[in-house]
Amino acid sequence: MNKMKNFKRRLSLSVPRPETIEESLTEFTEQFNQLHTQRNEDGRDEPGQLSPGVQYQQRQNQRRFSMEDLNKRLSLPMDIRLPQEFLQKLQLENPGLPKPLTRMSRRASLSDIGFGKLETYVKLDKLGEGTYATVFKGRSKLTENLVALKEIRLEHEEGAPCTAIREVSLLKDLKHANIVTLHDLIHTDRSLTLVFEYLDSDLKQYLDHCGNLMNMHNVKIFMFQLLRGLAYCHRRKILHRDLKPQNLLINERGELKLADFGLARAKSVPTKTYSNEVVTLWYRPPDVLLGSTEYSTPIDMWGVGCILYEMATGKPLFPGSTVKEELHLIFRLLGTPTEESWPGVTSISEFRAYNFPRYLPQPLLSHAPRLDTEGINLLTSLLLYESKSRMSAEAALSHPYFQSLGERVHQLDDTASIFSLKEIQLQKDPGYRGLAFQHPGRGKSRRQSIF
């Protein structure tokens, strides 16, 4: 239990003894009443002095505003169904705006609604299982929406896995349309459950269902969304470190979202030393393969290039089974690196030890003929040996390859979906096998979280 308290403290989730819901509601309603009294003492119009029609309209406006204000103050999803008794206690008909709730009041209120409780969610199907965690498809009793429940087993000797700590600590602060939303966090003595928004598929499954033959327009839309989410992370000094098609989730609308931040890191300076045992082998850059532990955001950009190629061709770019084979595949396509293409490479002991043949670079167009000239240029800019020379996610968003998407895609708010623009729609994939990713009606965004 002490370990769990320490874990919560690290995530800024622990507080002194929280106020009871009655105490927090009293505080909330007192703020309403004080403001109401102050308004009358200041000589402003009271409801009795207004005509019935004006009184009714005023009450309706105040009630609507109060409900919206409550959602904002508690950071609730827009489709939340608050218990009726909870709404009655808040006395939403009172006019005026209270000052913001304290952190303790907010958390007590959230707990009263049902957040942070296992009984709020119903497990439906088991989606997968790993060393530390099992993922279930579930349903929220609060919203009736589907959710993904990532149940992490807590070993009493070790406490919460560091990957879980990283994932929660990073995701609770990331609010972007192309990053999976963490809705809730539930802890017990035996497990830590992360409640995520549910998405129907991932990029690997999408490729499988379209026969590994994607419409090139869809490739562009998915690529832009990947870069949007990644640029948002990189601006906040966060490296994902495990980009691969399986970690790019896709819903029926076609929205692509970065997921699985278990290996992600918040970096303070570009040269900070990290483990080189990160990133699935096929998407691992050559500098990391050769043992480099000093890297920054370019570690993710090599993987982006590999994913672009895979979407365009339907097959992985460098499917090596060992580090040596992976390097061999890279060098055979891009040419064995030299001091000109990769300054300092000859001083890397691992590179000298492998003693690779001297391959000449091959034209990428011959391997990815469906990519146009701009697409090949973007791919080339991502697959550079010298990490600092790779194009950044922010710069890639402005690459001419995306010009056909229009200018408005660059003006969206972080939480706005690219599909909120009527000109952005997926097209039918040539190899379509029956998995529908149709564009549904545009409703309000549900990307809201309690964090």
From Swiss-Prot:
Q: Mind listing the UniProt keywords for this protein, alphabetically? A: ATP-binding, Kinase, Nucleotide-binding, Phosphoprotein, Serine/threonine-protein kinase, Transferase
Does the entry feature the keyword Nuclease, yes or no? no
At the top level of its lineage, which domain of life is listed?
Eukaryota
- EC numbers: 2.7.11.22
So where's the catalytic machinery, residue-wise? Answer: D242 (proton acceptor)
What does the record list as GO biological process? positive regulation of myelination; regulation of cell cycle phase transition
Output a single Gene Ontology CC term carried by this record.
cytoplasm
**Protein kinase domain: which residues?**
121-402
Classification via Gene3D superfamilies: Phosphorylase Kinase, domain 1 (3.30.200.20), Transferase(Phosphotransferase) domain 1 (1.10.510.10)
Q: Where is the composition biased (Polar residues)?
A: 52-61
Please name the InterPro entries in this protein's record: CDK, Kinase-like_dom_sf, Prot_kinase_dom, Protein_kinase_ATP_BS, Ser/Thr_kinase_AS
Q: Which residues form a coiled coil?
A: none
**One Pfam entry name:** Pkinase
Region (Disordered), start-end ranges? 39-61
Q: Which residues carry this modification: Phosphoserine?
A: S51, S66, S109, S417, S420
PROSITE patterns assigned to the protein according to its UniProt record, in alphabetical order: PROTEIN_KINASE_ATP (PS00107), PROTEIN_KINASE_DOM (PS50011), PROTEIN_KINASE_ST (PS00108)
Query: Can you provide one Gene Ontology molecular function annotated for this UniProt record?
Result: cyclin-dependent protein serine/threonine kinase activity
Tissue pattern of expression reads:
In brain, kidney, intestine and at a much lower level, in fetal tissues.
Q: Which reaction does it catalyse?
A: L-seryl-[protein] + ATP = O-phospho-L-seryl-[protein] + ADP + H(+); L-threonyl-[protein] + ATP = O-phospho-L-threonyl-[protein] + ADP + H(+)
Give the function comment from the record.
May play a role in signal transduction cascades in terminally differentiated cells.
**Family named by the database record:** Belongs to the protein kinase superfamily. CMGC Ser/Thr protein kinase family. CDC2/CDKX subfamily.
What is the name of the protein in this document?
A: Cyclin-dependent kinase 18
Its source organism is: Rattus norvegicus
Give the gene name. Answer: Cdk18
